[in-house]
Swiss-Prot record:
Family named by the database record: Belongs to the intron maturase 2 family. MatK subfamily.
Function: Usually encoded in the trnK tRNA gene intron. Probably assists in splicing its own and other chloroplast group II introns.
Protein's UniProt keywords contain S-adenosyl-L-methionine: no
Gene designation per UniProt: matK
Protein's name according to its UniProt entry: Maturase K
Length: 505
């Protein structure tokens, strides 16, 4: 990674621009757009459309297009369009605007990406895992030992000028920020750029990279108050909590106590105070949770602190119910597409003392995840796989495809759902979802062939069922042979990019 960063640094001449604090001249370098669009450095991202528009394929065509578009963005009256600028109206303008936004986002990411290389910024490298992969060991190993959890919804949207002021502290390049302001004002829905829901902003589809950069920078600033949590590492390790129950509980008490120095003038016993408990923080998309072993009063203080920080620093008002404080033993919270909580599981321990033995009844806390069936059915309703009552219907849009293509599409969705929710404690709730998809597939085939579901199932036979079974189910059943597979949680590290039907908010 560092070698690649050095090569890119030398190629982009970043050293010279960093000393002058200017990123704006990089907009007129064609290789920026080639790198932003994953093209080769020798190919031109502008050549193909310029051939259709009558441009000469020279080296100045891309720079000319960028200059003209930037000029149009800086103009105050967007209704004045000359005849020579007719190429930038309609779908052509949308293409060039998207192209420049991709390159512009890549340029704006340079100051942030430099921080990832410790040798460039001369900072210490943090060894803790600040990614989604660190969420799973936190849920499995640490959450069951905590008492309270705050379910936090990151406030949005942020005003454009406040966002630019925040970026000004990170990017000291006035021309680039001014161009960003003009570019955002060019779109009427710029106020919804910071909304994490993809369906609320067409800008996220046309300029996804710039949208992600703006949203990540906004979330980064919202989380800046929690920067001290970097010092607390959360490595990928799994330690069973069933062994040494009493000893673990004893040392857990000792860790949270400190002895105050005794004053010689007062003949009193040593005073014991509780340490300030550690606050754990994890986030996925626009939702985050804070959990701790502290009291409800301290959690309310944290809530008050976060709300005031967002209001004073970003002028953001937390949404009604944006922060919920619940006790883990009595309430569940919705996170990562699961309804999660901590439940007490009865446990019997056999104790042996010399020749006598006796049984001890105790209870241990266990992290529990449940697949919320109603939100998933709501997602299937939006995708038109079933009605509001959960009754499967045919997917008429796919009726023109081949039989194998229809079966493969439904099977792909079913496998992704099973793959994503493999971390559930009770997988039998997914049987209804699989039934809806399987019957919707049969109804789609029956609609195509103008037949009935019974005839389709009899004709296809096992072929219709085999597509909905995954190879990984056979592998997992072989690994966990002799155990109850439905009660085993298996977290796959690629679930962040496979399931679009899971409602995360």
């Amino acid at each position: 990674m560092e070698k690649l960063q050095y090569e890119l640094q030398g190629y982009l001449e970043i050293d010279r621009y960093r000393k002058q604090r200017f990123l704006y001249p990089l907009l007129f370098r064609e290789y920026i757009y080639a790198l932003a669009h994953d093209h080769g450095l020798n190919s031109s991202i502008f050549m193909k459309p310029t051939e259709n528009l009558g441009y000469d394929n020279d080296n100045k065509s891309s720079s000319l297009i960028v200059k003209r578009l930037i000029t149009r963005l800086h103009q105050q009256n967007h209704l004045i369009i000359s005849v020579n600028d007719s190429r930038f109206v309609g779908p052509n303008r949308s293409f060039y605007s998207q192209t420049i936004s991709e390159g512009f986002a890549g340029i704006m990411e340079i100051p942030f990406s430099m921080r990832l290389v410790p040798s460039l910024e001369r900072i210490a490298k943090y060894q803790n895992l600040r990614s989604i992969h660190s969420i799973f060991p936190f849920l499995e190993d640490k959450l069951s030992h905590l008492y309270y959890v705050s379910d936090i919804l990151i406030p949005h949207p942020i005003h454009l000028e406040i966002l630019l002021q925040t970026l000004r502290t990170r990017i000291r390049d006035a021309p680039s920020l001014h161009l960003l302001r003009c570019f955002l004002h060019e779109h009427h829905n710029w106020n919804s750029l910071i909304t994490p829901k993809k369906s609320t902003s067409i800008f996220s589809k046309e300029n996804q990279r710039l949208f992600l950069f703006l949203y990540n920078s906004h979330v980064y600033e919202c989380e800046s108050v929690l920067v001290f949590l970097r010092k607390q590492s959360s490595h990928l390790r799994s330690i069973s909590s069933l062994a040494f129950l009493e000893r673990t509980h004893f040392y857990g008490k000792i860790k949270h106590l400190v002895v105050a120095p005794r004053n010689d003038s007062q003949r009193t016993l040593p005073l014991w105070f509780f340490k300030e408990p550690l606050m754990h923080y994890v986030r996925y998309q626009g939702k985050s949770i804070m959990a701790s072993r502290c009291t409800n009063l301290l959690m309310k203080k944290w809530k008050y602190y976060l709300v005031n920080f967002w209001q004073c620093h970003f002028h953001l008002w937390s949404q009604p119910g944006g922060i919920h404080i619940n006790e883990l033993s009595n309430h569940s919270f919705y996170f990562l597409g699961y309804l999660s909580g901590v439940r007490l599981m009865p446990w019997v321990i056999r104790s042996q003392m010399l020749e006598n033995s006796f049984m001890i009844d105790t209870a241990i806390k266990r992290f529990d995840t449940i697949v919320p069936i109603f939100p998933l059915i709501g997602s299937l309703v939006k995708a038109k796989f079933c009605n509001v009552s959960g009754y499967p219907i045919s997917k008429s849009v796919w009726a023109d495809s081949s039989d194998s293509d229809i079966i493969a599409r439904f099977g792909w969705i079913c496998r992704n759902l099973s793959h994503y929710h493999s971390g559930s404690s009770k997988k039998h709730s997914l049987c209804r979802i699989k039934y809806i998809l399987r019957l919707s597939c049969a109804r789609t085939l029956a609609r195509k062939h103008k037949s009935t579901v019974r005839v389709i199932c009899k004709r296809l036979g096992s072929k219709l069922l085999e597509e909905f079974l995954t190879e990984e189910q056979e592998i997992v059943s072989f690994i966990f042979r002799g155990t109850r597979l439905r009660s085993e949680r298996i977290w796959y590290l690629d679930i962040i990019r496979i399931n679009g039907l899971v409602p995360h908010s």
